[in-house]
Amino acid sequence: MALTPAVNDINAWINFFCTAEIPVLKNTTLEIEQLKQDEDRLCARALTATIINDPMMVFRVLCYSQKNKSSHQLQDLVQVEQAVMMMGTTSFFKNIPTNFLVEEILENNPIALKHLLKLIHRAHRAAHFAADWATHLADLRAEEIHTAALLHDLAEMLMWCFSPEKMNIIHKMQEADKTIRSVTAQQNVLGFKLQDLQKALVEAFQLPPLLSKLMQDDASTEQRVRNVALAVNLARHSANGWSDAALPDDFHDISELLRIEINRVKRIVGAPELE
């Protein structure tokens, strides 16, 4: 494995990620290997069902698809199943190896692994919220919204993999002082904000422009972008329960997005009824 950057330089990290192999979850590798051995079950849909459980694997598939798209391909592929179908299962197994595991990288740092797995769980909740709301809004391409929400915090996931010590410091700072904003802690420890790393990462890997736009919180006046941003916020603020002070504002914003009552928003997202 290439040496991680010793300096707090966002460009150095982008250069590192561009040459580093992106790890995947152990369970992803096991399930894909099982499919590889089972010709009766092996198909693009079965592979997709496994891939979408792992944000880093989703990222790898979309990056490969974008980098190797045919000259006859008229549009970028944002949906994983479409990307797998276009490359075919033979090309998938040949060009996207899954033997570099998150659990091996963080074998000696179980605390970082715990935080990473929690972050991945949060990403899945955000993706579920976003896709559910997209359906409510009659968005015919809800899968694109799902993918954008799932990958919204990819940079943070990768930093937990490759810079767990610094990420642990950030976490401890925020645990010790709840008033410290995450971007402040990140700037102090890493020398940059993770949202800036995310933007640079998406640009460097040339992900589809649509996906990039859907993950841009600063463009959240547009309905689809706002959907993703609000889903990510809700998943973050409710990660440790439903008592976070930011949740009332989240519920209000979601009610405006969906054009429904706040009490109905709470029922839809599974928030408990408080006396």
Per-range role (PLM):
Residues 237-243, 263-270:
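Terminal end segments
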Residues 258-261:
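RNase H-like, two-metal
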Residues 177-186:
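Substrate-binding clefts and substrate-entry loops adjacent to catalytic sites
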Residues 1-165, 186-248, 252:
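Conserved alpha-helical "signature site"
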Residues 271-275:
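Extended, compositionally biased alpha-helical segments that mediate assembly or anchoring
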Residues 164-176:
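Post-HEXXH active-site segment of zinc metalloproteases
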